[in-house]
């Protein structure tokens, strides 16, 4: 499975709504389920890729250089897109600055999504350091304040909801 080419074009539009369509993957294949940058990869494993929307956030949906944001987020509709049940998965593909990655995810949640039934965040890093108190506190804050558990792994995450 290879990554899609949907995000190679420039996204225009003033409002988030105008930018949303151009920031959403239009692939009609399983490429919709994967993102990859600089050797870091996230794969969403679901039975029907048509129930997934992949949205590029950084440089597409949100272009403001001063605003922190994660790289991608996925909407997954486990009961089909006609149902009101949707899950949001925030993905940051990062080198080794985990604190910065967490801050980007939190900023994206605050900016975009407040009332999603299930949220989960993922950081795929080149090197995940030993857990320290700062990282643990940020993870706990994310879980408590946004009800959003966080998974951090090196190089690749394959997630099956």
Where are these regions (language model features)?
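Domain-level recognition of nuclease-like catalytic cores that cleave nucleotide substrates
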Residues: 2-9, 14, 60-62, 122-161
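Active-site metal-binding core of divalent-cation-utilizing nuclease and nuclease-like domains
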Residues: 32-80, 100
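Glycine-rich, often proline-containing surface loops adjacent to acidic residues and nearby aromatics
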Residues: 84-90, 119-122
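An active-site-proximal "capping" alpha-helix that borders the catalytic cofactor pocket
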Residues: 108
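Arginine/glycine-rich "motif VI" loop of SF2 helicases in the C-terminal RecA-like domain
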Residues: 111-118, 144
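Charge-rich, low-complexity N-terminal segments
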Residues: 1-51
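Active-site-adjacent loop/helix micro-motif of nuclease/hydrolase catalytic cores
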Residues: 62-65, 83-84, 97-105, 131-134
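Conserved catalytic cores of phosphodiester-cleaving nucleases, focusing on short active-site segments
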Residues: 72-74, 87-95
């Amino acid at each position: 499975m290879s990554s899609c080419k949907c995000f190679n074009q420039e996204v225009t539009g003033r409002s988030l709504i105008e930018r949303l369509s151009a920031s959403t993957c239009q692939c009609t294949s399983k490429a919709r389920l994967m993102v990859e940058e600089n050797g870091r990869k996230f794969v969403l494993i679901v039975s029907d890729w048509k129930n997934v929307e992949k949205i590029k956030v950084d440089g597409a949906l949100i272009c403001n250089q001063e605003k922190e944001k994660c790289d991608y987020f996925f909407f997954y509709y486990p009961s089909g897109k006609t149902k009101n049940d949707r899950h949001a998965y925030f993905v940051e593909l990062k080198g080794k600055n985990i604190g910065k990655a967490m801050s980007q995810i939190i900023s994206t949640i605050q900016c975009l999504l407040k009332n999603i039934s299930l949220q989960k965040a993922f950081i795929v890093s080149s090197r995940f350091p030993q857990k320290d108190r700062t990282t643990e506190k940020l993870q706990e804050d994310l879980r408590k304040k946004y009800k959003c558990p966080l998974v951090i792994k090196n190089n690749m995450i394959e997630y099956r909801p």
